[in-house]
């Protein structure tokens, strides 16, 4: 039986020494939402709880200000 390699999860924000996540940094926020627009849970991304809360708040702010879409484009 083949065993697959599971990559170790780590918090990117802790590794980079980020103090506060910025809601205007769309490139970073897009990495943490799915194609359908949902926020990816920390058990998948490996983000620490402190940064996951900040991330959720920033994504919601960016959505409210129309920087990020609430959902994908339905066609």
UniProtKB/Swiss-Prot annotation:
Protein's name according to its UniProt entry: Small ribosomal subunit protein bS18
Keywords from the UniProt entry: Ribonucleoprotein, Ribosomal protein, RNA-binding, rRNA-binding
GO cellular component, one term: cytosolic small ribosomal subunit
Origin species: Yersinia pestis
Keyword Kinase: no
SUPFAM superfamilies noted in UniProt: Ribosomal protein S18 (SSF46911)
Superkingdom, taxonomy of origin: Bacteria
Annotated family: Belongs to the bacterial ribosomal protein bS18 family.
Gene3D superfamilies in the cross-refs: Ribosomal protein S18
One Gene Ontology term of the molecular function aspect: small ribosomal subunit rRNA binding
Subunit relationships: Part of the 30S ribosomal subunit. Forms a tight heterodimer with protein bS6.
BP terms from Gene Ontology: translation
Cross-referenced PROSITE patterns: RIBOSOMAL_S18
Function comment: Binds as a heterodimer with protein bS6 to the central domain of the 16S rRNA, where it helps stabilize the platform of the 30S subunit.
């Amino acid at each position: 039986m083949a065993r697959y390699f599971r990559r170790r999860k780590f918090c990117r924000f802790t590794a980079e020494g980020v103090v506060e996540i910025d809601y205007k940094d769309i490139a970073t926020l897009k990495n943490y939402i799915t194609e359908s627009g949902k926020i990816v849970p920390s058990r998948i991304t490996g983000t620490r709880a402190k940064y996951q809360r900040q991330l959720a708040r920033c994504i919601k702010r960016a959505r409210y200000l129309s920087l990020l879409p609430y959902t994908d484009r339905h066609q």
